[in-house]
């Protein structure tokens, strides 16, 4: 019998890869921050395994536009899931169902040499479940 291989996003011991310690964040408007809110390129898939080969480097022909922040279910992708009643998928910890809606977001951001002379932190709020980030093709 073939053993099912657990995927990275099924490992409950992984709470972050390459991320800073969690802490309270207080914000103020400053020239030292860039908002990434706005239109992003978006590709919806039924499962992460369906991600196109090299998607982090390839173009976005055939991708859609989606506003960030938003919830893709409210933009016509997938359906809303209300877990206060009943899960819509079989629960078999630690395995994630093979049909696992996935969104790939892309945005081009240009930073000046002056900006890059300082530490730069990429901060995401409200990401649901697991996610990966590539910057200039680097994981």
Segments predicted by a language model, with ranges:
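Generic detection of short hydrophobic beta-strand segments and adjacent strand-loop junctions
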Residues: 34, 66, 107-109
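N-terminal glycine-rich cofactor-binding segment
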Residues: 82-94
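Mature N-terminal segment immediately following signal peptide/propeptide cleavage
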Residues: 32-43
